[in-house]
Amino acid sequence: MTESAMTSRAGRGRGADLVAAVVQGHAAASDAAGDLSFPDGFIWGAATAAYQIEGAWREDGRGLWDVFSHTPGKVASGHTGDIACDHYHRYADDVRLMAGLGDRVYRFSVAWPRIVPDGSGPVNPAGLDFYDRLVDELLGHGITPYPTLYHWDLPQTLEDRGGWAARDTAYRFAEYALAVHRRLGDRVRCWITLNEPWVAAFLATHRGAPGAADVPRFRAVHHLLLGHGLGLRLRSAGAGQLGLTLSLSPVIEARPGVRGGGRRVDALANRQFLDPALRGRYPEEVLKIMAGHARLGHPGRDLETIHQPVDLLGVNYYSHVRLAAEGEPANRLPGSEGIRFERPTAVTAWPGDRPDGLRTLLLRLSRDYPGVGLIITENGAAFDDRADGDRVHDPERIRYLTATLRAVHDAIMAGADLRGYFVWSVLDNFEWAYGYHKRGIVYVDYTTMRRIPRESALWYRDVVRRNGLRNGE
């Protein structure tokens, strides 16, 4: 450990109060000029994920995405995460950039393959050292670290043993989570166990890693949730706030002629994860479907582990799901056979969805799952903007984010218990099977690794400083 790291550790906890200061009794407001103010203590942040930005693929462990992205035909244009944004070597410069852009909280993920390269057994000190340095750098610049423990990057050895379809993976996750907490827990207060387990269980079977169409998907769902529940044991190890991040989408039926389909799709897309984690039971629709797809062992006892208190529910929002009244079914989601969708269910809606869907979703979550604070852990849009010298104009992104934040403000005014917002993403990055074609609020020249803040990054800096939107935005 360096001297600077020891100094930063001695002052541990600096900045953590920002996330701990959740909204209590403070209301969002609109002033006479039409400006929109967010609640006192509202959390403003930005997000990334390890495999999407770190690079350094030959250093400190190999994950399933390293293998998948090197498989011909799996990723657009043959892109890989070998170098990505080279954040592994440039993290200090990136943190200084974030500080200059006014970021207060940074959501990142820890790469499991760097910490426990074989999935179980010895912990890799070099992997922990990297995140140790990253956390100290963040705190040194007044930025609160907000790590996610699993963002789809599974050690390849565990994938070879069955991945999340194997029950043992949940227990290996708990061991890994404890190892990370032992190293970082003296300075990190808030933790997210899993990011978008729906993607790891379903989307991975044909678009993302591992790409195996015969994965027992509902068994993987259950084991991901079990891993989340086992990860919540960090509370007894001293963790402050613990949460789970889900990708959630309102389901819209085209017309009454699609009766019944909407509730079934909502159960598969949303309640399949919400209900076990927050209510201690699976939706009846999912139980019926599971009966034909998975043998879960002892789900009753497992649900006691899965259903433990969480401090925050992270919401990743990009799109709604709209059912069509006509046309052929176009999806590969088990349990939704015969239901027609306006677009394939597995495709993330880029560049950006209608923001009013987010308002609807936040109000529904606060109504159906009271007592759990909400935080938007990802939201953003991708547009085909290009650098023009030292500037990158992206007015479409600014318009989208403005409309989204207005919808978010409306939801708070209507009673949603929303406590924060993380824009996706800080940097252009490796967008999984899409390669490098999606974009963040900071432009990255992948030849020189130069970073150029887009106009949206400067706009977002002003939003954070004002804790709100000006009239006319």
UniProtKB/Swiss-Prot annotation:
Transmembrane segments: none annotated. Keywords: Carbohydrate metabolism, Cellulose degradation, Cytoplasm, Glycosidase, Hydrolase, Polysaccharide degradation. The keyword Cytoplasm applies. Its main location: cytoplasm. GO terms for molecular function: beta-glucosidase activity. Its EC number is 3.2.1.21. GO terms for biological process: cellulose catabolic process. GO terms for cellular component: cytosol. Thermostable, retains about 70% of its activity at 60 degrees Celsius. The active site is at residues 196, 378. It is an enzyme of class 3 (hydrolase). InterPro entries: Glyco_hydro_1, Glyco_hydro_1_AS, Glyco_hydro_1_beta-glucosidase, Glyco_hydro_1_N_CS, Glycoside_hydrolase_SF. SUPFAM superfamilies: (Trans)glycosidases. Shows greater activity against cellobiose than against aryl-beta-D-glucosides. This is Thermostable beta-glucosidase B.
